[in-house]
């Protein structure tokens, strides 16, 4: 296939009116490498890389933690239709036996061209700090456990790309030292202070789970996890872009503070995404969703009800430059989990995960 005359998003964040060549599901460098010369006229359209959501629990009344193959496939189809072509289903804090079944599901689900591609699993619990548990069930939280993690990853067929860890919990130092070369270790759901967080980053935990949420605020005398992440140029930070979790001023300032290569937009979406107001569930707890805000009975925000593409558009509406928002939803998440050689930009050799939009970033077609 040849996609003609589109405004193609470049690796540097600029647009260039050019043709894009696809052969056997991959982007190639020239028309000479294309056997199927079918043309798709993209005149007047923007051509974006498919989005990469590394932190999402579910959508359309299904949750990864349901351990349901058909439900997971439905989530993947929803995500693909909304411009998310690479996806990390994300678990909650649950008993070990349940987690093993959940991770097996990701290995077993049938995927085709209607689905977002599973590029890894995000293991958000159970190695969290009860003080900052958020919407996770405290009774299932446990100390960092290397063998527990490895059992889960074995059940997942080695697909776990990311694991959240509270570095102030007993056993975290050994966990980071032992596993930081096997999996991306993300600091999150923690009351850790700056010193603790900075030391964890020094040991190899160079990612932060949903910055600002489920951690202490940054103070001028105690900068905490946020300050440690800002100070470490190798640290990537997730940020929920739904317009509910974080104030627009903070969103804009985060991009200024961390630059255009370290912010990873995520949805943190749960099963209410794509649904109407009503009652739903997350991690075994009842959640009320009203006007895209999902909360537990005590008012705690319980994930988002917004897909990543809409999160990206939301942060643009807050004043974040379009190029930075798109990079934060494509290249940056791909880099953060080590898959940028396959996805995240429209570069020859990578998967032809392509989203066509109008000038206002309304989706026209997902390839």
Each language-model region and where it sits:
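Histidine-rich, glycine-flanked metal-binding segment
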Residues: 1-48
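C-terminal cap of metal-dependent C-N hydrolases
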Residues: 6, 335, 345-367
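Di-metal (Zn2+ and/or Mg2+/Mn2+) metal-binding site signature of metallo-dependent hydrolases
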Residues: 45-69
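Divalent metal-binding pocket/active-site signature
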Residues: 123, 130-146, 150-224
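Active-site-adjacent C-terminal substructures of enzyme catalytic domains
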Residues: 196-324, 329, 335-340, 360-362
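Active-site glycine- and acidic-residue-rich loops that bind
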Residues: 95-101, 168-170, 186-191, 240-252, ...
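Residue-level marker for buried hydrophobic side chains located in beta-strands
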Residues: 50-52, 186, 263-266, 355
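Divalent metal-dependent hydrolysis catalytic cores, especially in the metallo-beta-lactamase
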Residues: 57, 61, 73-102, 116-129, ...
């Amino acid at each position: 296939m040849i996609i003609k005359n589109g405004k193609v998003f470049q690796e540097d964040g600029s647009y260039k009116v050019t043709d894009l060549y696809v052969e056997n599901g991959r982007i190639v460098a020239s028309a000479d490498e294309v056997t199927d010369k079918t043309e798709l006229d993209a005149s007047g359209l923007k051509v974006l890389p498919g989005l990469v959501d590394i932190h999402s629990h579910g959508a359309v009344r299904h949750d990864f933690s349901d351990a349901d193959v058909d439900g997971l496939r439905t989530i993947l189809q929803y995500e693909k239709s909304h411009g998310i072509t690479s996806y990390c289903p994300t678990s909650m804090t649950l008993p070990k036996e349940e987690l093993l079944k959940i991770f097996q599901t990701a290995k077993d689900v049938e995927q085709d061209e209607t689905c977002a591609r599973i590029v890894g699993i995000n293991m958000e619990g159970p190695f969290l700090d009860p003080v900052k548990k958020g919407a996770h069930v405290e009774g299932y939280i446990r100390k960092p456990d290397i063998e527990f993690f490895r059992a889960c990853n074995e059940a997942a067929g080695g697909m776990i790309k990311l694991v959240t860890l509270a570095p102030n919990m007993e056993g975290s130092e050994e966990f980071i030292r032992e596993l930081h070369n096997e999996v991306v270790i993300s600091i999150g759901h923690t009351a850790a202070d700056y010193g603790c967080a900075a030391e964890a980053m020094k040991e190899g935990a160079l990612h932060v789970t949903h910055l600002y949420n489920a951690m202490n605020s940054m103070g001028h005398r105690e900068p905490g996890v946020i300050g440690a992440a800002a100070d470490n140029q190798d640290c990537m930070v997730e940020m929920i872009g739904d317009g509910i979790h974080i104030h627009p001023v903070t969103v804009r300032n985060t991009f200024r503070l961390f630059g255009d290569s370290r912010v990873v937009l995520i949805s943190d979406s749960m099963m209410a995404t794509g649904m109407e107001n009503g009652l739903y569930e997350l991690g075994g707890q009842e959640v009320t969703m009203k006007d895209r805000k999902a909360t537990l009975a005590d008012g705690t925000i319980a994930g988002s009800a917004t897909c990543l593409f809409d999160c990206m558009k939301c942060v643009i509406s807050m004043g974040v430059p379009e190029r930075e928002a798109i990079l934060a939803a494509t290249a940056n998440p791909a880099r953060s989990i080590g898959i940028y050689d396959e996805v995240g930009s429209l570069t020859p050799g990578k998967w032809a995960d392509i989203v066509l939009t109008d000038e206002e970033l309304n989706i026209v077609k997902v390839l």
